[in-house]
Amino acid sequence: MTVITRFAPSPTGRLHLGHAMSAIRAHDFARARGGRFLLRIEDIDVGRSRPEHVAGIVEDLRWLGLDWDDLSFQSARLASYQMALDALKMRGLLYPCFCTRAEIAASLSAPHAGDAAVYPGTCRRLTPAEAAARMHDVRMGGAHCWRIDMAAALAVTGPLWWEDARAGTVCADPGAQGDVVLARKDAPASYHLAVTLDDAAQGVTDVVRGDDLFAATDVHRLLQALLGLLTPRYHHHPLMLGADGERLAKRTGAPSLAAMRERGEDGLKVAAGVRAMLAGDAPHLPSS
C-alpha cells in the first residue's frame, strides 16, 4: 500500500515554525517510504480565509524546500459534505440547535454544570413541533447549527478504537465531547466532518498532526464508523514550544516564516534546523 500523508493548513494567517515542523514531519514520513505528500487548503471558513494567505502558504513551503503531489481545496468539496450531512440526518443522528454561544456559556457557568465546556443538549430535548417552529425562524434569518446526537450515534457504532504511533491502541471516547457541531449556517461543515471526509476521499493512510488534535480523533473515528470510511493510522506529535515554554500559535503572535524569509534567512537551513530538533525529540523553538 502506498503511504499517503497530508498537510492541511487554514489560510487565515501566515505559517510559523510550528506549522513548518508539522509539514516537515508529514512530508518526510511519506518521502522516506516512497509515498505521496498532499497539500490541502482548509478554506471552508469563508469569513476568515484569505486568497493572499493561500499564496503565502505555498511560498512558505517552497521556501522550506518541500514539494507535494497534489494541491486541493476544501471549498471544492462542499457537495460531499452536504451528502454526508443528509445521510446522517436521514438516520436521525443529527438535530438542529438554535442556542447562541452566549446561551451555552450561561448554561455551562451555572452551579454544578461541571468544568468541561460540553454542550448540555438543550435543543436535543425539543419536541418535533418545537424544532419545526424554530426552523421557521431560521428560514426568516435566524441562526442555527447541526449537532450529532452522540448517544444515538454511539448506540449505532458500539465501542471504537484507533491506532496512534506513540499511544498505541486508543479506546475512543467521543461521548466525552458531547453533541459536537457538524455544520453551521455560515459553515457547511465543521472541522470534524470536513477533515474526516477529506482524508478518506484522498486515501490518506497516515495522519501526522499535533497533540492538540488527539482528543478530536475520537470524534473522527465515530464519523468514520457511521459513514463507512476507512480509518488511517495516526501520528500525533508534540507541539513546538517557544522560549517561554508556551505553544507557538498565530493568535499569540508567533513569528511567521514570511518574517524569517524577509530577514534573509535561508529556508533550507531553517528546515534543516527543524529536522535536527526533531531528531533530538525536543520540539522547542530553535535559537536563531
Segments predicted by a language model, with ranges:
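Short alpha-helical "patches" and their helix-cap loops
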Residues: L38-D45, H236-P238, L285-S288
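Residues that form generic nucleotide/phosphate-binding pockets
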Residues: D60, A84, S107, L126, ...
